[in-house]
C-alpha cells in the first residue's frame, strides 16, 4: 500500500505529511465522497500519473466499494497499473480486503 492509501485508511498519517501527488488523491477521494454524500470516496493514481475517483455504488443490482469503483474506472480507461490509492469514509475505517485486493490485482 502506498502512503496515501495508508493515510486515508486510518494509519494516522495526515494529509500534511504526504507529497503533493498523494495529497491530490486524498483530496479527490474526499471531494468525491462529499459531492454525493456517499459512505465512502476513493481515488487511485495509475503508473502514468492519471487519477480516477469514485464513490460507493449501492444499487439494488450492483454494489461496489468506492475503491473497487475507482479501480474499475482505471481498468476501463486502460490503466497499465496503479501506484497509489486513497480511501476516505466517515468512520475512518480501513477499506475491506476485497477492495484492497482490486488495487493489488492491477
Where are these regions (language model features)?
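N-terminal first-folded block
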Residues: 20-53, 58
Amino acid at each position: 500500500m502506498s502512503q496515501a492509501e495508508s493515510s486515508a485508511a486510518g494509519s494516522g498519517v495526515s494529509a500534511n505529511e504526504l507529497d503533493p501527488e498523494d495529497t491530490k488523491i486524498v483530496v479527490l477521494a474526499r471531494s468525491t465522497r462529499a459531492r454525493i454524500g456517499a459512505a465512502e470516496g476513493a481515488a487511485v493514481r495509475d503508473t502514468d500519473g492519471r487519477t480516477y475517483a469514485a464513490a460507493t455504488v449501492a444499487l439494488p443490482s450492483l454494489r461496489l466499494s468506492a475503491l473497487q469503483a475507482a479501480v474499475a474506472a482505471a481498468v476501463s480507461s486502460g490503466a497499465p497499473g496503479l501506484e497509489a490509492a486513497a480511501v476516505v469514509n466517515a468512520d475512518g475505517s480501513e477499506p475491506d480486503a476485497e477492495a484492497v485486493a482490486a488495487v493489488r490485482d492491477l
